[in-house]
Every structure is written in C-alpha cells, then in structure tokens.
Design a protein with these regions (language model features):
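Catalytic-core regions built around general acid/base machinery
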Residues: 34-46, 105, 109
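HAD-like small-molecule phosphatases
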Residues: 82-165
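Non-catalytic pre-domain segments flanking phosphatase-related domains
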Residues: 1-20
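Substrate-recognition element of Asp-dependent hydrolases with the DxDx(T/V) motif
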Residues: 39-62, 118-120, 163-165
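A general structural motif
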Residues: 11-13, 46, 73, 114, ...
Length: 165
C-alpha cells in the first residue's frame, strides 16, 4: 500500500503531555520560540497538547494561551492532576478536592510551626504570611497577586484542590 506525503507529515501521536517548569519552560519560566513553533506544528498535525503542572490553573493559562490551546482544544492538568480543564471551553472535566477535615489541621500545624501556608482564591494567592520567600516565589511563577488575610481558612476557594506549606 502506498503512503502519501500527507500521511507522513501527520504525527503518530494523538496527545503530547508536558510538564511546565524545567521541561516545557526555560529558567525564565518561558516557552522558547523554537519549542512554541514545534508545538504549534504538532497541533496543526493533529496532536492535542496537555500541560501538566503542580501550578494552579490560573498559573498555567498564560502558557496555554501562548500555545493557542483555547483554539486547538488542549488540556490543563493543574494541581498535579487535581484539576483537569478543557482549554477550548474552560470546562472543568475533573476535580479532586482536599478533604474538608484536613484543612483546619494543616492550618493549625502551619501556625504552630510558624510556616507559611497559602491557598488560592480566583486569580489570587491568599496567605497570612505574604512576605514569606516561598509565597513570593509562588506569586512570581504563577503571575498571581498575593492577598494578606488574617485567617486563611476564611478566604479559600469553597473546595480547595491544593494548599502549599
């Protein structure tokens, strides 16, 4: 059976899953032009791009946008797979929340040890310790503002997927 040029140009893969930090992005947390061009071609050849990260959804969206995933129908696996989002529709396809009874225990433990604990509320990081170096780094990486709160548990999303200590 003869194979056409068009068949050769199609990738044998239907999906390409990529970790972000240190894999897809460089040290500046950016996708290089060559990588972007390669992934755009892969999408044109029929591959779906899946961005997988421990980052919150909001912190992955700029990378997804830079790769045109809102048009091509890629996916975001945020919070280390705790939330899966269809980039074309922004529909949550899957969510796995922290058990409600664990949140006060984590909060109390962090307070007792003097550790920063952060969570997310929309496009913001919420924390009682906004000057902590790790809170600032999370803000920088994800391009999210930090909001200082008196009591973290009063300001979290209704069903948090991730807290970071």
């Amino acid at each position: 059976m003869a194979t056409t040029e068009a068949q050769h140009s199609r990738l044998p893969y239907r999906a390409i899953a990529l970790d972000l930090d240190g894999t897809l992005t460089n040290n500046a947390k950016e996708v290089t032009p060559l990588t972007r061009e390669t992934l755009l071609k892969a999408q044109a050849d029929g591959a779906h791009i899946i961005l997988a990260s421990g980052r919150p959804t909001y912190g992955i969206i700029p990378v997804a946008d830079s790769l045109g995933l809102e048009e091509t129908g890629g996916y975001i696996l945020a919070y280390n797979g705790g939330k899966i989002v269809d980039c074309k529709t922004m529909e949550e396809l899957y969510s796995n929340f922290l058990p409600a009874e664990v949140i006060p225990m984590l909060h109390q433990y962090a307070r007792s040890k003097g550790y920063a604990l952060l969570g997310y509320a929309g496009n913001e990081i919420v924390t009682e310790m906004p000057d902590d170096q790790y809170v600032k780094e999370e803000s920088r990486i994800n391009h999210m503002n930090i909001r200082k709160v008196e009591c973290l548990t009063d300001h979290l999303e209704a069903h948090p997927t991730k807290l970071l200590m």
